[in-house]
Amino acid sequence: VLARRTDVAKQEDVEALAKAAYERFGAVHILCNNAGIGGSPGASWELSLDDWRWVIDVDLWSVIHGVRSFVPRMIASGEESHVVNTASVAGLVSGAVGGPYTVAKFGVVALSEQLYFELGRAGHPIGVSVLCPGFVNTNIFDSGRNRQTDYGDSDIGATPEGEQRRAALNAMRSTMIQPAEIGELVFEAIRTRSLYIIPTGSEAIENAVRARLENVVERKNPGLDFSIL
């Protein structure tokens, strides 16, 4: 086991992690770009640039850094391997959560799809999966405690609206997907080399994704009231 403190928002930190991993183990066969934060609550026009940068740097740029630092080494090894990028159902459907988070997760889905095509067409034995769950019972709602000093402070979460949102999310914990269930889905996707990892059994999520795709094809405006719960 190699534990190394890493700021995934910084390319040099992720590159140092990759170097250390290859020096210790000689190869990396499964790469999970999983670090993520929820961000500050608030409308897109209310959030500061630091609020936007914080979420996009951690949720999207971290995946880009992981791909750039690890995938070339995985290609060079020539061994069968797999990349798992954590996105969200918010990377498939807009309007359910905050703007920065949605933008970042849509980016992770697009990057994963692009990587799938690039690696496959080049003939590299590297699979790609993108994980798109709904709400999972983790501490992502408390991610403000880990906000790097580079991004300053945000007082939006201290507003009554922000506190109400946090309380509502915490009240949902008993109905959320458990991390162990997600882990089983990820391992199965690696075994079957599946691109999309979306938990089954959530009719609301499936309906929302299907409705979005139909709206795009039919050039229809989406409805303003929907749920992914």
Please annotate each region the language model reported.
Residues 5-16, 49:
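The beta1-alpha1 cofactor-binding region of Rossmann-like NAD(H)/NADP(H)-dependent oxidoreductases
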Residues 20-33, 40:
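A glycine-rich helix->loop->beta "capping" turn
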Residues 42-44, 51-53:
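Substrate-binding pocket helix/loop in short-chain dehydrogenase/reductase
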Residues 44, 93-100:
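Active-site loop immediately N-terminal to the catalytic Tyr-X3-Lys motif
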Residues 67, 104:
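Active-site helix of classical SDR
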Residues 88:
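Residue(s) in the substrate-gating loop at a strand-loop-helix junction
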Residues 121-197:
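SDR active-site lid
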